[in-house]
Each structure stands twice: as C-alpha cells, then as structure tokens.
C-alpha cells in the first residue's frame, strides 16, 4: 500500500529521578549521602532509509515514544539513559508541526535529532552542605517533550513523467526501468506513483517517477488532484509524455493543458527543465513532420539527435546543448523532443542516453 501522508505523535523519554541514599559501612554510624543521578530520557530521531518509498508502516502505529531514564542508584551510580526511539522514514519525507515545515529529510542514511529526552534528576549527594550533612532530598527527572507531527512524503526522482491518463507513462517506465506498474488500456490504471531505476550502462543510471495521469482541473483537486503532483516537485527534469495517436486532442493541446495545470499548481514546478516525448509514434503517419512541427510550435530551432542510434524515428535536440549536452540553466525551451513507442520500445535505448545527458 502506498501512503504519503500520516499524522503521528512523537515523545522523548522522561528523565529518571535522583536517588536518596546514604553510605553504609561497618563502623560508620552516619555515612554521607551517596544517591546517584537519574538517567536522561531517551531521544527521538528520524532516520532516512533508502529501502522504503512509502509511509504505510505508520498507519497502525500512531504513538512513537522513547524510553524513560532509569532512577539513580546508591554509591553515586547514575541511572541508565532511556533507549532512544529511531523513526525510519523514506527519502523525501517532510515533517510538519501545525502546518509549518519543521524537518526535510532527504539524504539517505542520515539521522536527525527531533526531540531531546528529559534531563535526569540530581541525587541527594549534590545537596550536601556545611549546614546540611544528611540531605533527604533528590530531584525528579525533567519531563520529555511531546509533539503531534504530520509526515508528508515527496518522492525523490531525477526524471518525472507528466501526461494525461492512458498516454503510456506506465508502459514507458516499465520498458526502460525495473518498475513493474499495473498496465491496462483504460484511464487511471496508475493510482499511485511508481519509481523505477533506469540503468544506462554499468556505471550510470537515474531514478524515474511516474505519477497518475493529470486531467484538467487537477491543480484544483479534480481526478486524483494535487495529492500526487507534489511527487514531481523534487525532480530535476520533467518529461511530458504526449499521445501522438490521439485524434480528439492533438499534441499541442495536450502539452498546453498539462503545462497550464503545472503552472496553477506550482510556478516553480512549471519552470523546471523539460523535454517532450511523443509516444505511440509507430501508429502515426508522417511522425517526422509532426515532430518538426511541434519543435516549431515550441520555438525550438532543433538539431537532429545524430549522436544516438534512433530506431528509426528522428528526435531533436536543443541547439544550446553542446555535444556534451551542457545546458544553460536559464534556458526555458525544451531540452529535447523525441518520438518513441513505449510498447515496441522504439527509441527506448536512445531515450535513456538523452535523459541521462539532460541531467548532467
């Protein structure tokens, strides 16, 4: 089950109480105080685990509390510190307190202190003085801290696929990555985001995210709404997947409507570097002309992607990208326009290299 939002209560441990005790030895009638300090309460940490991509494990457990510190002992022995509580979350988890962002947990294996445990109380040995040789008082431990927090997951991926329902995004991610999403010939087959690792060669690869299809009004909550648009906010490059075979809605209209929804949801998201994939090109007549016309529509004076083995349809590359694909970060035009067929894997091999270079 994919879960990307939960509310939990976290609490650090209470400090242990100090000890009231006196030294007892043979031939010593009145030994001095030797009560030890209480142990500190356990701390609460968030730890990022790269092996998980959902918050589903929190659905059945709302309270997450560290252990209390142990009481102080005799002979000035300090009580044991309470056991820490380690809360494991996937990369991209954000922690909110009262709708204010508190922690942003991105880096894998990183452990972040959230709540400090209460300090242990002082034993009676600390309170001996010139006028009070036999103190019978010890401090209580300090209380721990409790917070109600909301965990929100924003998946971390390099490439984010954006498209209408049934555009072929799930088929594409299953073709070029290790992801195995549900695929069927009807809209909204994808109900949750999918992550896939794309291996380009033995040393290179990247992470791709496929979110449920966007419909008009998604930014206002229609369809699956904004609940999944947030998962492409962290991506470095967006890939618009357009259905080149649709007769009721051309690729220009598809692109314009998708971009409008992104702009309404987040201008920063809409301004990310992007490319365009014309899917289902194997069932479209004169796809090369359609591709060139679309480049003109984007005001893209494109150069052919001659550096790649295209099979057999030509793709186009932004002219500001050098032979090494070094791009201008202020450039807002498409980085590439590439016809492909996710079903038959036409141009799928070239797509891996194009996306990898676009990330560099």
Swiss-Prot record:
Its EC number is 3.6.5.-. GO terms for cellular component: cytoplasm. It comes from the Bacteria. Its cofactor is Mg(2+). The keyword Hydrolase applies. Residues 157-360 form the OBG-type G domain. GO terms for molecular function: GTP binding; GTPase activity; magnesium ion binding. Keywords: Cytoplasm, GTP-binding, Hydrolase, Magnesium, Metal-binding, Nucleotide-binding. It is an enzyme of class 3 (hydrolase). Disulfide bonds: none annotated. Mg(2+) binds at residues 170, 190. Residues 1-156 form the Obg domain. GTP binds at residues 163-170, 188-192, 210-213, 279-282, 341-343. One of its GO terms (biological process) is ribosome biogenesis. It is found in: Cytoplasm. Monomer. HAMAP family: GTPase_Obg. NCBIfam families: Obg_CgtA, PRK12297.1, PRK12299.1. An essential GTPase which binds GTP, GDP and possibly (p)ppGpp with moderate affinity, with high nucleotide exchange rates and a fairly low GTP hydrolysis rate. Plays a role in control of the cell cycle, stress response, ribosome biogenesis and in those bacteria that undergo differentiation, in morphogenesis control. Belongs to the TRAFAC class OBG-HflX-like GTPase superfamily. OBG GTPase family. This is GTPase Obg. It comes from Helicobacter pylori (strain P12).
């Amino acid at each position: 089950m994919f879960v990307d939002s939960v509310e939990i209560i976290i609490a650090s441990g209470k400090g242990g109480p100090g000890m009231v005790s006196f030294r007892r030895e043979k031939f010593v009638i009145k030994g001095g105080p030797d009560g030890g300090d209480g142990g500190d309460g356990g701390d609460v940490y968030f730890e990022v685990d790269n092996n998980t991509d959902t918050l589903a494990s929190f659905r059945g457990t709302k309270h997450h509390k560290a252990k209390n510190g142990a009481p102080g002992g005799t002979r000035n022995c300090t009580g044991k510190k309470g056991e820490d509580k380690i809360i494991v979350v996937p990369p991209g988890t954000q922690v909110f307190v009262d709708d204010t962002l508190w922690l942003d947990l991105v880096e894998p294996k990183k452990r972040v202190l959230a709540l400090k445990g209460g300090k242990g109380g002082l034993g009676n040995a600390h309170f001996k003085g010139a006028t009070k040789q036999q103190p019978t008082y010890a401090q209580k431990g300090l209380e721990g801290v409790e917070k109600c927090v909301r965990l929100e997951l924003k998946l971390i991926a390099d490439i984010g696929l954006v498209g209408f329902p049934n555009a072929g995004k799930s088929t594409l991610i299953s073709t070029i990555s290790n992801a195995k999403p549900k695929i069927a010939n009807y809209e909204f087959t994808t109900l949750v985001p999918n992550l896939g690792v794309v291996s380009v060669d033995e040393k290179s690869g990247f992470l791709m995210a496929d979110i449920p299809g966007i419909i008009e009004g998604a930014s206002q909550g229609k369809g699956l709404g904004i609940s999944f648009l947030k998962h492409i906010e962290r991506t470095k490059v967006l890939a618009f997947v357009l259905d080149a075979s649709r007769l009721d809605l051309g690729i220009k209209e598809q692109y314009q409507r998708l971009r409008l929804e992104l702009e309404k949801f987040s201008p920063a998201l809409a301004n990310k570097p992007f490319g365009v994939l014309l899917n289902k090109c194997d069932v479209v007549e004169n796809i090369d002309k359609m591709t060139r016309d679309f480049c003109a529509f984007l005001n893209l004076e494109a150069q052919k992607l001659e550096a790649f083995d295209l099979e057999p349809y030509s793709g186009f590359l932004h002219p500001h990208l050098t032979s090494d694909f070094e791009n201008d970060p202020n450039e807002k035009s498409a980085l590439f326009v590439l016809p492909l067929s996710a079903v038959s894997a036409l141009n799928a091999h070239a797509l891996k290299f194009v996306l990898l270079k676009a990330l560099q």
